[in-house]
Amino acid sequence: MGDYLLSWSWILDAFETSDENLSQNKFEELLDARIAAFQQIESPVTGTLNSNKTTEGEEAKLSIYDSSHSISKSQLESVKKISDITGYNEAQVAYVLLVHQYELNTQYFSQLDNDSVLAQEFQRRYYAEIISCWKVLAFLLQACTDADSKWHKMATRLIVSIFQTAQRSGENAQSTTPSIFCVRIIDYLSKMTSQAAPASLTFNGEEAISQWYFFHFNLQLQLLRVIFLSTYSLVVCNSEMAISWFNCMKKTRYLHDQEFMHLDIDTGFSMCKEITNVAIIISINFISLEKQVLSFKDNPSFFMLSGNTIISLHDMITQLSNDSIGAAVSLTWGIALHLLSNSPDNIPLIQNSSVVSSKILQNPQNSFQALIIAALKYDPFTLIHRIISSLEDDPYIDGYSKIMATLFSSAVSYVKFSDSTMLCATTLFKTPQVYQLFENNDSVTRLLNFARARFPFEYSQFVLLLIPTFACLTSKQLVSSELLHMTTFTQSLPSGFKAYEIIPEPNVTGNALIELQESLHLDSYGFFFPNAERSLPKGTRGRIVSVDTYPPVVMWDLNYSLWEAVGISLNYIVRNGLINSHKSFVLTVLSSSVPLFQTDVSGACELVHLASEGLDGELDFINVICDLLDYFLSLSVIEDADYQICVSSLRLLREFTRFAATDVWAYVTRSLVCVGSEKGISLEDVIFDYESINGVYDFTLAFFDLYEILLDNCISTSVVPDDFSIRLKTDFVKRAMRFLCEVFANYLDWKYARIIQQYQIGHRFASLITKLLNVTFGIEYFNPKTTVNKKTLPLRELSHYIVQRFLVQQDSNRYLHPLLSVMDLINLLYTDIFSTISSPRAKAAKMWLISSFCAMKTLICLRGFLNLKPSELERELFSRSPDLFNCLPRLLCCIAPILQLLSALILAPWPSETPSLLAYMINSTDIVGRVCIQILTNPIQSTNIEGSVWKFLSSIMKGQQQGLAVLLFSGKKFPLDRMKSLNHNVDVQLTSKSLISLAEKRLDSFSINDILSQVPVFEFIFLSRNFWTASLGNLQQEANFWNRIVDAIKLPLTVKLDGLSSVAQADLYILAAHATRITAIQLHMSKLNKSNSSKKIIIDPLKDSMKDLVQHAFTITAYDSNIHNALTRAFKHENGDLHISDLRNTGLFPLRYGDNYFYNIKLAKNMLLNTEDTSFKISMMMSANENLSLLDAQAALLRSWSIFICAFVEFVKEDATLSILELKIMKWVLKSLAEDTIDVNVVQELSAERAALVFRISQQTLAIPISNEVKEHLQSILLLTWKAITTTKFSIYEDSNGEMAYYRPLLHVLYNTLNRLLSEEKENLSLSVGFVSGLLQLCHRKLSQLFEKAVINPTIEVYGDIVLLNSLHKCIVNSHLIRGLQSLYISYINDSFSVDNCLRLFSWSHSLLVDGQPYFADAALSFLLICSSSPAGAEQIVMNGFFYSIMESPLSTALSTGGLGLDGSSIQYKIWIRGILPLLFNIVKFLGNRIMNDMREFVLLAFPQIQYALLNWCQPPSSISLASIDESFMIVLLFDLLQQFNPALLQEIRLAELKIEMLEASTI
C-alpha cells in the first residue's frame, strides 16, 4: 500500500466535531499546504501521477499538496481499472485509493459483483472528498465572519491567502483580486450546468448515472454556498462578478433549466428547487440593497459604479422579469434602481451615468416602475416564503433570512398588506436573531401593528403576534406587559346587531367611531373570547374598519390578556364540541405556541398561568391541551390537520412536564395508550397506520421526546416523590417501552418522506436505552442488585425489560437486529455525512452511528456487570470486527465510540475463554495496526481520539488477545491463503513506525500542560513492555528512553503541585505510576538475565532522590476529611431515604478522574432537584470526587512503588552495595505508616499493603552482613515498626474489619529484626525498658485474646497469629532483655489471663481441629512452655490448673494406654515430647516438692507411655526414630530431677529396673 494521505472528509469531520483538544496550529499547517487545492476549482483532489520503477514493488508516485505518495503495483492496477470504468482521471482515482487504502484494497475489489457497483463505490468516495473540500472552505469563510470563533484568526489568514493567490484563467492569468476566486467558481458553475455524465458511466447502468447526477447537483449546491459566504460579508460584488453571475442566471433561469431527469422525481424536484432558491438569494445578495442606500464612495469596487454593468444587468434581469422564478430578483433590482434614482449623490459617481439615466432611470418603458410592477404580479412575497421554508435545514439559513428580510422591509412599502405579506413576514421573522435586526424598522413595526390590529378577525396572524415575545424569551429578556396584552379586538359585527351608537367626529369621514349600548355576547358567532364573560362590555368603543363587507368589521378599543383569551377560547371550543369547525384555529394556535414553550422554563410556566387565568384551575390550560389530544386520538380516522394537532399537542405536553409533571402524568396514564383499544385510535394506530403510510414521523419523534422527559421526571422524583401514583407511572412506562421497542423493531422497513427521520428514530431509541441503563445500573440507588425500593420501581422494571430484549441469544434477536443493522448502512451514512449538502441530515447520521455504538457498548458492559451469559450481540460484533476497523479511517466522529466498543467487547468476562479477535480478522490482521498508526500519525487528531486508540491497544493486552497482540507488536500478518503452507508467518512491516516506537516517540513531546493525553501512552508502554518481555523476550531501549521514564518518575518532585488542580495532580500521579512500573519490569528482566545494566539506567539516576520519592509515594496526604464530613452532614437530614452512598457510581463503566469520579454528579443534579441546598450538595460532591480522584491516584502511585521496591530488593541480591539503601527504604515506608493520620476506613487496605511490603523487604535483609551502620538501621527499623504497631488509627486488639492484615506483617518484621539483632549482638543489644515491656504486654494481651477467639473460631489464620506472637514472645523471654522485668512479666500474665485462656484452649483443643489435627494444643503448650521458663511463670501455670487440664484431656487416654508414637508422626506424640515433657521438667525444676502430689498422679497416669518409651529400645534400630530418642532423653532428665524431690515415687514405679532393661536393650 502507499503512504498515508489525509482525506478532506477527515479534515471536515475534525472541524465539525468541535473538539477543544484539536490543535489549531496543526490545522493551519495542513491547510497551508493545501491552499493550491482551492485554485483547482474543477477538481481540488487532482494531483500528478508519475511512473517510478526504481523501488521494488513500487510502480508510481502521486504528487499532491506538496507531498509525494507511493503507489504500489496492485494499487496502480486498480487505478487503471477504475479509471477505465468511470472515465475519471487516473490521478483522481489514485488519490481516492490512497485516502481509502485500507478499505479499497484488492480483497475488497474482488468481492464486488460488477463494474456498476465498483463505479458507484468509487463515486461515493470521490465526491465525498470533493464536497468535503468545499465544505472546509465554507467553514473557513463562515469563521472569518464570526469574531468569536476560535478559528477566526486562522480562517481569516487562510481565506486572505486563498483570495490573493486566485488567478484568472486565460489571457490575464497573472492578475489577482479577491473577486477573481468567486468569478472562477461562477464560471465553473456555469460550465457544470451543461455537463453530462462521463460517457464511460453509461455502460454501468442507470444507477451509476443517477448517482453521478445526484453528486453533481450536490456539488453545485455546495459551490453556491461558497459563493454566498464569500460575497455575503467578505467580497464586494464588482462588475466582473455581477456580469459572470447574471449571465449564468440568464442562461439557466437561475440554474433551474438543467437535466434532473436521471434522478427520481422527488429527489430531482427537491434538488432543482433548492439550487434555484439559493441562486435567487445570491442574486439578491449581489444587488445588495443595504449598499444601495449608502454612498458608493464607501465601496469603490461595487458594480453599481459601472454604468455599462448596470445596463447589462438590467437587460439580463429584464429578460427574466416575466418569469415567476425571477420575480424576487426583479423586485430587488427594481427597488435598487428606485433608490438610485432618489440618490443624487450616487448618480454622479457612476461611469456613463447619463447613459444609465436615459436608458433606464428616465425611460418609462424600461424603468424600475415597470420591473416592480411586473414582479409584484407574481406575488414575490409568497415566493420569498417558499424559498426560506424550503431552505430551513440549510446551515446558512440565518444569512438567507437576513437577506430576504432586507428585501422584505424595503418591498413592503410598495404594496398593501395581504395574506402573502403576513405569511412572508411570519416566515422571515420567526427567527429571533433576524427579528431583532429589524424590530426597529418602520415598515416591520407598521406591519406588526397592523397584524395586532386585525386580530382575531384574521387569526392566521397569531404567529406574528408571538414573534416579539419569542425573541424576548429566547434571549432571556423580560417580556413587557405590552407584548402580553392586546389593546384592540377586531371582529365582524353579528348580523342584525344594532345596539351601538355612532359617535360623530368633526373632520373624520371614514372609519366611523361607534359605542356599544349594551353588552355584545360573542358566543353566538365567534370563537375567540377576550375575557371569561365571553362578551364586550357596554360602553366599549370601536371603529368600523371595513364598510365594503357585511356585516362590517369593527376594531374595538379593548385591553385584554392575549394568553388568557387563548386559554378561554380553546377551552370553549373543547367543552362545546366545536373542535372540527375550528380545527384551523386550533392548529394555528398550537403550532405557533410550541416554540415559545420550548424556551426558558420560567417563561413557559408564566405563559401557562396566563392562559389559565380565565379557567377553573391554576394550570387548567394543560388540561385543555390534553383534551384536544384525547379528542383527536379518539377519532376512527385521522387526517393531516388532525395529525399536526396531535404532534403539536405532544410537543406542548413535553414542555409542560418541565414544570407541571403531575398534570402530564395524569393525562398520559389515563388516556395515552400505546396499543389499540376500544376507545379509538392509539399511538400504535397513528404510527403504524398513518405515519408508515405517509412516511412522516413527527408524532413518533415527539413521543420519544415526551417519554424521555417523563423518564427524567421518574429520576428527579425518586428521592422526594411527587403526589402521583408509582404504580400508574410504572404501568405507563412499561407499556410505552414495549411500544417503542416495537417501533424500533420495524422502523428500518418503513417508508420515509425524509430519510433524516429514520436516522433520528434510530438515534433517539439508542440514546434512550443507553440513558436508561446508565441510570438504573450506574449508581447504587437504582441498582437492581440492592434492596428493592418502590420509588425506583419504574426504572427497575424498564431496565429488566431492556435487558431481556437486547441481551438475547441467536434465536430471539428481533430487537437486536435493528441495532446491529447500523453497521450494514455505514456506506449509506458515509454518503449522507460527506457527499450530501444537508447539514441536519449529516448530523443526524453521525448521531445515529455514535448513539448506536454507545448503546452496544453499554449493553456489553452490562452483561458482564450482571454476570449474564454472553449474548448474540457480542458474537455478532466479533464477526463484524473487520468491518468496524475498516470504517475507522473514514469517520473521525466514530473513532472513539468504535474503539471504546471494541475495548468493552475484548474485556467483557466470558465463562470460558474469550473469543479470539485474531480468528475473526484472520484475513486482515495487519489492518488493526495500520489503522491505529494512521489515526495516531494523523496531524489533526484530538487527544481524546488518540487516547481512545492507546486504550484500545492496551485492552488487547488486558483482554486475553495475545495472538493479535503478538502480530501487532511484531509487525507481521497471518493471511488465510498461507495457512496450508509451512511458513505461516510472513514478515510485513506495518510502516516505518511501529506502535511501540510510536508510543515512545510521544514521550519526546511531553508537556506538563497536557498530562491527561500522556497517561494512556504510558499505560500502553507499560503493558506492551510487560507483554513483550513475557512473550517475546527482552526489548532493549536506548538510554534517552530511560532518561524520559526516570524523569516521569520524578514528576511528583519536579513539578510544583500547588499550581495544578486536583485532577491534574491525579493524572500526574498515574503517569508517574506507569513510569515506575515500566522500570520495575526492567529490573525484573535484568535479574532474570543476570544483567547489571538496570543499575546504571534506572537505580543510579533515582538513588539521590529515592528518599523523597518513596516518602512522597508512601505518605497518603490527599484525603480531605473536612470535605467528606461536610458532605455526610449535608445528606444526614435529607428527606426521603437518600444517602450519599446511594449516589456512588457502581463501576458499570471505567471511571475517569474528575468531578464525576466517585459520585455521579449528572444523575445527582436531576435527583436532587426537589431537595434543599441542591447547589451546595452538588458542589460538595464535586469537591469530594476531585479529592477521591487524587486519593486513588496516590494509591496507584503507592502500589507502583511497592512493585518497584520488590523488584529493587531482588536486584539488591546481585549488588550488595545497595543494601543500605534497602534498609533506608524500610525506614521510610515504616515512617509513613507511623505518621499516617488519615481515617482508618480510607487507608486500611493501603496500610496493610505497605506493612506487607516492609515484611517482604525484611526477609531480604536477613542476609545483610552486620556492621555498625546496619545495626543502627535495624534498631531504627525496630522502633519504627513498634511505633507503626502502636499507632492510634488501628487497634491490634480489634479485628472486626481485618486489622490483623495490617499488624501481621509488622509483627513478622519485629520478629525478623529482633531475632537478627539478638543473634548477632547476644548480650550487647540494648533496648529501652518501655519497648520490651510494651512488647511483652502486647504479646500476652493479644495471645490471650487469640486463645479465646480460637475456642470460638478455630481457623488457620488464628493458629498462625498464635504461632507468630509465640515466636516473638519466646524471642524476648529467652534473651537477656527479660532481665529485671520478671515482676512486670508476671503482672502481664495475671492481667491478661493469658495462661488461664491458654489452658482453656488446651482443654478444648481435642475438638478444635485444623485439617483434622489438634494444632491448637501444640500452640497452647508452646506458649505455656515459654511462660514456664521462670519460677513465677511455672507457678502461674500450675495454679491455673495445668495438671487438671492435662489429665482431663484426650491425650491422657493415649498416655494411660501407652504406644503413643507408634507411627512416629502423630501430632499428639509431638505434643507429648515437645510440650508436656519439657513443661513438666520446668515445673518440677522451679516448684519441686510443692507439686509432688500432682506430679505423682500424672506419672502414674502416664506410666504406660513412659514404660513403652523406655522399653522401645528393645526394638530393632531401624524402628527407633529421632522423636523416640528425644522422648527417652526427656523422660530420663525428668526422672533424674524427680530423684531429688521424690525418690519414693521412682521406687514405686520401679524406674531402676526400667533403666536396666533400657540399657541392656541399647547394648544389644
Curated annotation (Swiss-Prot):
Keywords, A to Z, come to:
mRNA transport, Nuclear pore complex, Nucleus, Protein transport, Translocation, Transport
Gene Ontology molecular function, alphabetical: structural constituent of nuclear pore
Which top-level group of life is the source organism from? Eukaryota
Keyword match Isomerase: no
Query: Which GO cellular component terms are attached?
Result: nuclear pore; nuclear pore inner ring
InterPro entries per the UniProt record, alphabetical:
Nup188 (IPR044840), Nup188_C (IPR041634), Nup188_N-subdom_III (IPR048883)
Q: Which residues form the signal peptide?
A: none
A GO BP term here is:
RNA export from nucleus
Subcellular location, record wording: Nucleus, Nuclear pore complex
Q: What does this protein do?
A: Interacts with pom152 in the core structure of the nuclear pore complex (NPC). Involved in the export of mRNA.
Name of the featured protein = Nucleoporin nup184
